[in-house]
Amino acid sequence: PQRGDIVVINRYTDEPLIKRVIFMGGSFFKPGNVTPTAEFNWWFDPEAARIVVRTPFREQIMVGLDVCEKMPFSSDRYQAFLAGQRPEMKKLLESTYAGQQFAKDKAFSQYVWDVLAAAILIDPSLITEERTCAVDVNAEFGPSYGQALAYPDNGPQGSQKARIVMTIDQERFWNMLTAR
């Protein structure tokens, strides 16, 4: 959820050293994961999400379900990831909820939403397809509460342009996670 981002925005919005802001959240061109129209983070607090995406940063990159749900973290990937870890890290990973699920069910998979956003922060060249749109969040209570909105041209007053990530170089991403 975006509420903590508001504290940072109120303090640092005009900071000239902020080159870009990368958000994990929203689902612009596909169904949501908690309602038919909303992704969890923006549905949980759409008013905060709206303030955040309307902040006039020089560059905004949105990492939503549009890209995140194209690349599940499968059992095979998890095992490959474990193989490259030190014993103490391997033990820690195996003790997590995901580690326990992978041990019980070889068909288990999950998405790595925040990890993907962090990887793009480290290396924006991972992005291979994006759409630049004015973005907004529906903060009106109702069936589409928390819906991520994208406008190819101009959006409502106050909305800002953002790069919505659609596809990344998956091979480079997974290699980044397993590299030592």
Q: For the regions a protein language model found, what residue spans apply to each?
A:
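Active-site histidine-anchored catalytic micro-motif
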Residues: 1-70, 75
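Conformational coupling and interaction surfaces
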Residues: 40-47, 60-180
